[in-house]
């Protein structure tokens, strides 16, 4: 069958055949408006995906005038409903193997038990340590890589180690973070924390593998449904994967995504001294960074796909099946919808061929002195005398999310008609004022210069909104009442970060500071003797390392019970670190944009490109895409051993999905299989070569010193 011509079931029901009765009236759901692939960053189990999907579905419903019920009172079959996710709140974060249990998307189970009707394809990627280098016997029970970084119990790290994030694309082919300043000073000693150690890390080519997989995912969609409207929403390092994936697509002759949205991107256009001190003459120049960004954005913005015309999928222009919106959505000027109970009008815009950058000056991660990413400062008109935003295509737009107040008012996202100049720093302001950062932490951050500004070119929104970064945690005094409006938020650790803390000094084997008094049956406690070491042996027998303890003393109570005073187990330490009493950590605001569902509802949903989403209407193909996008999943019943707290059956494809896998073109199958092999063994796929795609430019500062021009593509 031609890939362009496919039939599928739109709606179905069952009924008993009866004379003059038994009719079932079916209301077909309208087509979905788009496909949206979400890509996470480093050190990330994609905890923000649930909030992105929840906000996007609600926002798209409002944008398309798609209420939950129809005028007659029946449920609206076109209403988008997000998938549910397994979250720490489900069981108070008590799962013993948190990496396997939490932040897993439930494909068939929507939020609140409703049926899933979504446009989101969640993409997952990461690093796998080679088997022989995994330390599985540390006393705290956590697995470690060769450099002492925590891994999950399958030897992987979702998104790779936090320190391995890059500010450019060529570095993804390079060595990992070396952990040293000037080659010998420990950066962990200088700037590491319990949950974010600055240990050395493995080479970064697993990021190239992830970008190849993302490009393959888009290619698979394009082959089967060439007119689908595809968005890629990348967060943090996921934005660089998105850029690199498009460079691969260009060389493969495949059309780009229709819309790209980059959140909190660490992509840098400068040459920070702190970065130079780690890589010396191998640092990429601003010329290469700008040229690469310009070329990739021109590829995305220059291939605008006009099919379907938005007016052609509006209800008033569709005879029968085909409209993606409700009665108020007309696909152009004069759309109407209801938001917060009020009816309002807005002009629809065709976002195909657009790239949006969301940035925040309060991002303390990409605002680090060795990063200075565009997700912190946006893109200025000029960058050190070179064309910055002015050199990028017209389809590039940027929005600022800031909690800073000026003249007592907060900046409204989408509140200005473009273009609008936003000063990053006015007289009397300081870059990191009221953030709660101490002197040492401020020293490690970059600063704006007075007079720095960015041109905000993103269109107005139907309902301009304020940025709020306090969706999680508790705001510390004085909060929004500070002179600048900037505030600090402190929050408890999630189970993954708490486990990192356990592996990095948050638990000590013989620490009496968190001693536990426990009554134990004498027959158990004295099984091997009455001394402390014998009692310890009895208590630890047959238990995982994370459940073992050190016994300080044991005293018989005379009631058949023994009072054992012992140290907390690593597992108990993890649970302690997950509480406000155990540990509170200030948020860096690096995930503050996607972590607030209201940002996704009121901003992101309107910047997505819409038109057609047949691939996520095709139920089996949608399931297939979600499997291809998740590197943690296998295609055969061979992974049950690591899913001790999950239902392994949900991680295996059914026969229809497996048939799509078997029919996949050879090049894609090889990449899918190589990814599975890498996840299982750490053996890196040979399919990931050492050649840059043609849109990726490279020039080190040493190259520039020797007057060697920016080189595009070729061996690196």
Swiss-Prot record:
Membrane-spanning intervals of the chain: none
Region called Disordered, residue ranges: 68-87
Activity regulation summary: Neutralized by the immunity protein Tli3 in the periplasm of P.aeruginosa cells.
Keywords associated with the record: Host periplasm, Secreted, Virulence
Pfam families associated with the record: Tle3, Tle3_C
Gene Ontology CC annotations of this record: extracellular region; host cell periplasmic space
Subcellular location: Secreted; Host periplasm
Keyword Secreted: yes
SUPFAM superfamilies xref list: alpha/beta-Hydrolases
Summary of the function given for this chain in its UniProt record: Antibacterial effector. Is toxic once delivered in the periplasm of prey bacteria.
Assembly and binders: Interacts in the cytoplasm with the adapter protein Tla3. Interacts in the periplasm with the immunity protein Tli3.
Entry protein name: Antibacterial effector protein Tle3
Organism per entry: Pseudomonas aeruginosa (strain ATCC 15692 / DSM 22644 / CIP 104116 / JCM 14847 / LMG 12228 / 1C / PRS 101 / PAO1)
Underlying gene: tle3
């Amino acid at each position: 069958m031609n890939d362009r011509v496919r039939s599928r079931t739109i709606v179905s029901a069952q009924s008993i055949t009866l004379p003059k009765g038994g009719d079932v009236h079916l209301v077909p759901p309208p087509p979905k408006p788009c496909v949206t692939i979400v890509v996470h960053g480093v050190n990330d189990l994609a905890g923000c995906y649930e909030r992105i999907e929840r906000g996007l579905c609600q926002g798209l419903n409002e944008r398309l005038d798609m209420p939950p019920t129809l005028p007659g009172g029946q449920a609206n079959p076109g209403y988008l409903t997000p998938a549910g996710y397994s979250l720490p709140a489900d069981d108070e974060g008590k799962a013993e193997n948190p990496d396997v249990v939490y932040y897993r998307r439930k494909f068939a189970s929507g939020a609140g038990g409703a049926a899933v009707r979504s446009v989101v394809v969640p993409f997952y990627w990461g690093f796998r340590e080679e088997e022989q280098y995994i330390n599985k016997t540390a006393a705290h029970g956590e697995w470690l890589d060769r450099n002492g970084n925590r891994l999950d119990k399958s030897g992987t790290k979702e998104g790779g180690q936090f320190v391995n994030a890059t500010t450019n694309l060529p570095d993804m082919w390079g060595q990992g973070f070396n952990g040293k300043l000037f080659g010998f000073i420990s950066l962990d000693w200088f700037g590491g924390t319990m949950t974010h150690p600055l240990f050395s890390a493995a080479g970064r080519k697993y990021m190239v593998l992830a970008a190849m997989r993302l490009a393959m995912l888009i290619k698979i969609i394009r082959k089967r449904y060439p007119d689908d409207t595809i968005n890629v929403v990348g967060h943090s390092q996921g934005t660089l994967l998105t850029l690199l994936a498009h460079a691969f697509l260009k060389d493969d002759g495949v059309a780009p995504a229709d819309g790209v949205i980059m959140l909190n991107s660490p992509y840098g256009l400068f040459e920070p001294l702190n970065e130079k001190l780690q890589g010396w003459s191998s640092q990429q120049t601003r010329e290469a960074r700008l040229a690469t960004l310009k070329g990739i954005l021109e590829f995305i913005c220059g291939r605008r796909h006009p099919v379907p015309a938005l007016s052609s999928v509006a209800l008033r222009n569709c005879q029968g099946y085909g409209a993606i919106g409700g009665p108020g959505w007309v696909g152009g000027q004069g759309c109407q919808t209801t938001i917060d109970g009020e009816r309002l009008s807005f002009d629809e815009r065709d976002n195909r061929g657009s790239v949006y950058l969301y940035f925040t000056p309060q991002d303390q991660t990409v605002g680090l002195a060795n990063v200075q990413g565009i997700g912190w400062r946006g893109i200025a008109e000029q960058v050190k005398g070179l064309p910055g935003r002015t050199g990028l295509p017209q389809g590039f737009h940027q929005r600022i999310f800031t909690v800073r107040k000026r003249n007592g008012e907060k900046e409204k996202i989408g509140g200005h008609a473009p273009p609008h100049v936003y000063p990053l720093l006015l007289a009397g302001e300081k870059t990191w004022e009221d953030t709660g950062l101490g002197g040492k932490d401020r020293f490690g951050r970059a600063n704006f210069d007075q007079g720095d500004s960015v041109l905000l070119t993103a269109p107005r929104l139907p309902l301009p909104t304020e940025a709020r970064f306090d969706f999680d945690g508790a705001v510390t005094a004085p909060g929004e009442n500070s002179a600048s409006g900037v505030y600090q938020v402190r929050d408890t650790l999630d189970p993954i970060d708490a486990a990192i803390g356990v592996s990095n000094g948050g638990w000590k084997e013989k620490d009496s500071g968190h001693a536990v008094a426990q009554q134990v049956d004498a027959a158990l406690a004295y099984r091997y003797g009455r001394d402390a070491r014998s009692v310890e042996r009895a208590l630890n027998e047959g238990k995982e390392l994370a459940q073992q303890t050190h016994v300080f003393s044991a005293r018989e109570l005379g009631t058949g019970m023994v009072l054992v005073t012992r140290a907390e187990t690593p597992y108990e330490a993890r649970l302690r670190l997950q509480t406000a009493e155990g540990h509170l950590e200030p948020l860096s605001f690096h995930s503050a944009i996607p972590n607030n569902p209201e940002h996704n509802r009121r901003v992101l949903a309107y910047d997505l490109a819409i038109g057609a989403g047949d691939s996520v209407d095709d139920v089996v193909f949608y399931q297939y895409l979600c499997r291809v996008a998740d590197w943690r999943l296998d295609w055969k019943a061979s992974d049950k051993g690591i899913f001790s707290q999950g239902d392994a059956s949900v991680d295996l494809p059914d026969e229809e999905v497996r048939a799509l896998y078997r029919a996949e073109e050879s090049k894609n199958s090889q990449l899918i299989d190589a990814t599975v092999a890498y996840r299982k063994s750490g053996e890196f796929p040979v399919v990931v070569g050492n050649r840059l795609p043609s849109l990726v430019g490279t020039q080190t500062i040493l190259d520039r010193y020797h007057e060697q021009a920016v080189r595009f593509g070729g061996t690196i």
